[in-house]
């Protein structure tokens, strides 16, 4: 379901390990991202899969290795010199100051940005740029106020980009006043919308400060779906870490257990991806990544835990997230302009409508059972997208009692049941399954020990979630199935086996 990859700054930064927000050479590819030819291969590979590539450029500032700073430098005061044609001597908008501040109102800085952006587009064929901290594109000491010169500078920047590629994605991390962000959105730019903290509270089961409606473009009074909302980013703590460390509980229902934490993560995704407009997922969020941002330090490298694919609770998050994204891509009702919502408190809902389909998303974010109010658009038969079951609604405004963490997506038109999701899935014990050899050169034996006559289905997914091989058989007591996977490239895959209502997942390595 992913249709764009947004990288952190990949131009040359100071040091060997960094997020990249300490830029030194904006036009040079940092070695951490490979050689230029390898990076081009990456872009081409993404494009062949229908995935756009978006890079991150930091033009608010540059650090000391940058030649523009060094050529006009005041060594006595350790800052850009008064005659520096690109940079301010002092950052004019504290406290948000890093490195050496660019003056975005002078022509040399504009030319510098334009030449670099054009190079990245024409040389590497990137599809968009996320511009870091564009609220800093001002010389005003109060950057939180509306700034007409800043607006003009950003519109000029966007126009230049669209002159090179009319379909180019211009994304701003702006954090400016809403009237300014609305004007930029109206002009065609997209903007980051951080609602992580409200989603944290909802996921942890603390509902008094859990209203995440600010992640909806309509709530801000915007005309277009240009708000990129998200529950996690590089700047925020991992939601799963927050849940497992600080989550709420009541009786036997404890959000801090792995199983319930995973369910709470799915719950929040159900109320992120069903909101119309672009959404962003941070890496491994689909597997409930729960290593703290501060472990061992904020900008330190974090472990890549491929073993998460072998955990059934994390796999559940992965598959439900994939199904939610597939649903929003496949059915237009989840991209409608006609929707309402009630997201305060423990009972939350989203109601979406088109001329031919209505959808209602409803969930209980409390840690206790309680009433929710779906506010169905009409009475009659409604269908649960994830179970395939139906309900008959006789009173559209009547409450329903949900268990803690329970949620549903209802539609008044029967849609194809979500892929990846079976009935209430039970774990198929590892003692009932053998996969040999693993790692494999391509020929794999699958041995399944289940009741005779059981229907067994198996699928192999690549790391993007795409099904690359599948099959099914009717099991004898101990059935050996041979899988020819020689057509697959070397790498890690997920093998999912479903026998009746039982499921088994195993990481499969092709050498």
Where are these regions (language model features)?
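Short loop/turn microsegments at loop-to-beta-strand junctions
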Residues: 49, 225-226, 396-397, 431, ...
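C-terminal outer-membrane/trafficking sorting elements
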Residues: 426-511
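Short strand-edge motifs at loop-to-beta-strand transitions and within beta-strands
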Residues: 398, 408, 479-483
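Substrate-binding/active-site clefts of carbohydrate-active enzymes
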Residues: 2-126, 130-149, 153-165, 169
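Active-site-proximal helices and loops of the catalytic beta/alpha 8
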Residues: 9-11, 21-22, 47-51, 133-231, ...
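Short, compositionally biased serine/threonine- and acidic-rich segments at solvent-exposed termini, linkers
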Residues: 415-422
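A solvent-exposed, charged loop/short amphipathic helix patch at secondary-structure junctions
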Residues: 241-258, 298-304
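Active-site regions of oxyanion-processing enzymes, predominantly non-cytosolic
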Residues: 127-131, 279-285
């Amino acid at each position: 379901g992913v249709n764009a990859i947004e990288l952190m700054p990949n131009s040359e930064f100071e040091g060997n390990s960094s997020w990249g927000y300490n830029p030194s050479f904006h036009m040079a590819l940092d070695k951490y991202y490979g050689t230029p030819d390898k990076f081009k291969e990456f872009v081409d590979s993404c494009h062949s899969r229908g995935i756009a590539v978006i890079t991150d450029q930091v033009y608010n500032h540059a650090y000391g290795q940058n030649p523009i700073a060094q050529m006009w430098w005041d060594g006595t005061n350790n800052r850009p010199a008064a005659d520096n044609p690109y940079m301010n001597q002092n950052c004019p908008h504290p406290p948000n100051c890093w490195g050496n501040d660019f003056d975005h109102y002078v022509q040399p800085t504009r030319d510098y940005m334009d030449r670099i952006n054009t190079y990245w587009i024409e040389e590497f064929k990137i599809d968009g740029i996320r511009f870091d901290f564009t609220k800093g594109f001002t010389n005003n000491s109060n950057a939180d106020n509306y700034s007409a010169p800043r607006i003009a500078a950003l519109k000029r920047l966007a126009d230049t980009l669209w002159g090179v590629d009319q379909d180019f994605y211009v994304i701003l991390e702006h954090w400016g006043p809403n009237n300014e962000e609305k004007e930029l959105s109206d002009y065609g730019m997209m903007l980051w919308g951080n609602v992580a903290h409200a989603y944290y509270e909802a996921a942890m089961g603390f509902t008094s400060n859990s209203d995440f409606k600010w992640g909806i473009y309509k709530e801000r009074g915007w005309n277009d779906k240009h708000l990129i909302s998200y529950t996690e980013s590089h700047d925020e703590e991992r939601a799963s870490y927050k849940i497992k460390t600080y989550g709420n509980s009541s009786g036997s229902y404890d959000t801090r257990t792995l199983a319930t934490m995973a369910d709470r993560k799915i719950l929040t995704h159900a109320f992120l991806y069903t909101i119309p407009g672009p959404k962003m997922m941070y890496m491994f969020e689909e597997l409930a990544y729960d290593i703290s941002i501060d472990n061992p330090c904020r900008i330190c490298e974090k472990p890549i835990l491929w073993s998460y694919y072998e955990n059934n609770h994390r796999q559940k998050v992965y598959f439900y997230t994939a199904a939610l994204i597939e649903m929003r891509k496949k059915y237009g009702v989840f991209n409608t302009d006609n929707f309402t919502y009630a997201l305060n408190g423990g009972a939350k809902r989203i109601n979406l409508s088109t001329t031919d389909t209505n959808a209602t998303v409803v969930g209980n974010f409390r840690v206790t059972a309680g009433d929710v109010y779906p506010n169905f658009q009409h009475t009659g038969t409604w269908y649960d997208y994830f179970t395939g079951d139906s309900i008959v609604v006789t009173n559209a405004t009547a409450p329903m009692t949900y268990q803690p963490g329970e949620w549903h997506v209802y539609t008044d038109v029967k849609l194809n049941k979500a892929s990846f999701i079976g009935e209430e899935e039970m774990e198929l014990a590892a003692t009932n399954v053998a996969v040999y050899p693993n790692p494999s050169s391509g020929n794999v034996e699958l041995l399944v020990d289940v009741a005779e006559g059981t229907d067994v289905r198996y699928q192999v997914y690549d790391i993007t979630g795409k099904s690359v091989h599948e099959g099914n058989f009717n099991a004898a007591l101990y059935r050996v199935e041979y899988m020819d996977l020689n057509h697959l490239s070397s790498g890690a895959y997920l093998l999912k086996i479903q026998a009746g209502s039982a499921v088994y997942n195993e990481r499969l390595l092709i050498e």
